[in-house]
């Protein structure tokens, strides 16, 4: 679950990497929602894909605005080995869901839309919104531990699979499909944790 991933991510950051800051250079982040805004002018990258991992190279400016927290960071795409600047939405880092919940996304939308109240047409407001860096902030989570859903399509040499909180009523066909997907993410080593 996202909740368990948050616990593991904090454990890795605090006890293995000795990171005390909320976000540090060297942190690995996973994009949790496709984003086209920040790569428009970067040759070779069409968009930041849901599930893509980036490394934080430098943490720049943090801001609180519209009832949300943002941070400008310099990142490197692991897929393309290209460095670029993005604005991330800090509120998604520790959220117990994969991205920004619908109610909070709507709140962000409406709060930013107020900045364009001087524009009379809805189309004009939407055009401005599409170019707003805060509205287009990248939704991310730490990438040291990820859910099986987010891991689909990827492979890691070593995988730790937490089977805690699996009760007998979950042991149906969907569980075995999930288990197959999780097991096949491991390229070399698989460790089963919290076996029932």
Locate the predicted segments by residue:
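Core RecA-like ATPase module of SF1/SF2 helicases and allied nucleic-acid translocases
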Residues: 2-195
């Amino acid at each position: 679950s996202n909740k368990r991933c948050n616990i593991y991510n904090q454990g890795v950051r605090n006890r293995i990497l000795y990171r005390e800051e909320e976000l540090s250079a060297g942190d690995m982040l996973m994009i949790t929602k496709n984003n086209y805004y920040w790569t428009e002018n970067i040759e070779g990258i069409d968009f930041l894909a849901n599930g893509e991992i980036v490394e934080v190279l430098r943490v720049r400016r943090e801001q609180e605005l519209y009832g949300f927290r943002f941070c400008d960071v310099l990142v490197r795409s692991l897929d393309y080995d290209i460095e670029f600047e993005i604005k991330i939405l800090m509120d998604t880092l520790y959220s117990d869901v994969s991205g920004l919940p619908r109610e909070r996304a709507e709140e962000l939308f409406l709060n930013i839309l107020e900045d364009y109240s001087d524009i009379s047409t809805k189309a004009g407001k939407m055009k401005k919104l599409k170019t707003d860096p805060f509205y287009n902030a990248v939704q991310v989570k730490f990438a040291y531990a990820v859910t099986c859903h987010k891991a689909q399509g990827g492979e890691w040499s070593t995988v730790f699979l937490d089977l805690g909180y699996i009760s007998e009523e979950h042991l149906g066909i969907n569980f075995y499909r999930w288990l197959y997907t999780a097991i096949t993410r491991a390229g070399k080593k698989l460790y089963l944790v919290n076996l029932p």
